[in-house]
Amino acid sequence: MASFTTNSLALRASILANPRLPPPIIRPRLSLPRKLSFNLSLHNARTIVSSAVTSSSPVLSSKPPSQFPFSDSTRSITTLVLLAGVVIKSLIQKLSVAIVNLSPQIQASFRTASPLFFASLRDRPAGYLNTPLTVVAAGLSKWLDIYSGVLMVRVLLSWFPNIPWDRQPLSAIRDLCDPYLNLFRNIIPPVFDTLDVSPLLAFAVLGTLGSILNNSRG
């Protein structure tokens, strides 16, 4: 403490002795907050990292390939069905034109045979419908029987996980049966969370439709 006072007195004496000397310059110290530098450095680091990520990651503009619900086999089957329908329609038109242009002798033979035909129909049991709708009902019932068999094959093969469904004719069976089976998915909850019993409902609907068509036939 004594040395500090002596130094201050000596400094004052030197200033008074030589007034031309400039006074001592006391530089103020600037204290910046530490948090500001930390926030700035953190912000700069984030901007650098984000720019590096955006520059390094390429822009993916490739679109996923469109998935079609049906394969080529189903398309070929539908085209064949359409062609068969067109051919049948043309044949019916030609037959109708040919019947109109029949000779008088053939028309007379048809007129004589028609009463015999209707007389034979009288021996049918009661409730039998003699209309063109019975033919359509019979055809639909046959198609339902065939479709039920194909559906049974699809359900039985679904129990085997190693079946190659991408090959023919398995892909055609899958494309024909899956749209109908998907209508009954999640209607009945699976048993023990593993066994799907929704195909039973699908078979029940087919059986009901078949019985209705058979009853309409008489």
Curated annotation (Swiss-Prot):
Keywords: Chloroplast, Membrane, Plastid, Thylakoid, Transit peptide, Transmembrane, Transmembrane helix. It is found in: Plastid, Chloroplast thylakoid membrane. GO terms for cellular component: chloroplast; chloroplast envelope; chloroplast thylakoid membrane; plasma membrane. Residues 1-83 form a transit peptide. It comes from the Eukaryota. The chain crosses the membrane at residues 133-153, 187-207. It holds the Pfam family YGGT. It is a multi-pass membrane protein. Disruption phenotype: No visible phenotype under normal growth conditions. Belongs to the YggT family. PANTHER family: YLMG HOMOLOG PROTEIN 1-2, CHLOROPLASTIC, YLMG HOMOLOG PROTEIN 2, CHLOROPLASTIC. Not required for the biogenesis and accumulation of native cytochrome b6 in the thylakoid membrane. Not functionally involved in the pathway for covalent binding of the c-type heme to cytochrome b6. This is YlmG homolog protein 1-2, chloroplastic. It comes from Arabidopsis thaliana (Mouse-ear cress). The lineage of its organism: Eukaryota, Viridiplantae, Streptophyta, Embryophyta, Tracheophyta.
